[in-house]
Amino acid sequence: MKVLVVGGGAAGLMAAGAALRQGHEVTVLEHMEKPAQKILVTGKGRCNVTNDCTAEEFLHHVRTNPRFLFSSLGAFPPAKTMELFESLGVELKVERGRRVFPVSDKAEEIRQALLRYTDGADIIHDGAKKLLL
């Protein structure tokens, strides 16, 4: 099956990588010049990957409509996020507040890991501000 992912941010690249691993042909449309650029400014340039807690603990701290996230966090809890990045060669550390960062303290390492995860996807820079499907 052909899969189109609109947006090459962290979530879009995660979706693209998952689709690739299911054997789909994947195209990612991204309006920025390079995918996952915003990752570089998260966590003061270090990228807070996730929190080291269970899905239930995570949802307990969501103030607005936690039920919306229930199924996705049940299927892909924080521990799986950590396992994924470690499998992509990123060493992780847990800091105050159970926040998880790359040991390197460089968000670029997370960005590069996501690009490796999507290796095989067609990533197209379209420059579009609006997209009609």
Predicted features along the sequence, with ranges:
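Short beta-strand to alpha-helix junction loop
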Residues: 69-79, 96-116, 124
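A conserved short coil-to-beta-strand element within the FAD-binding core of flavoproteins
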Residues: 124-133
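Glycine-rich FAD pyrophosphate-binding loop
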Residues: 4-6, 20-44
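Glycine-rich active-site loop/strand segments that organize a redox cofactor
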Residues: 46-94
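Conserved dinucleotide-binding and phosphotransfer motif residues
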Residues: 22, 88, 117
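N-terminal Rossmann-fold NAD(P) dinucleotide-binding loop
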Residues: 12-13
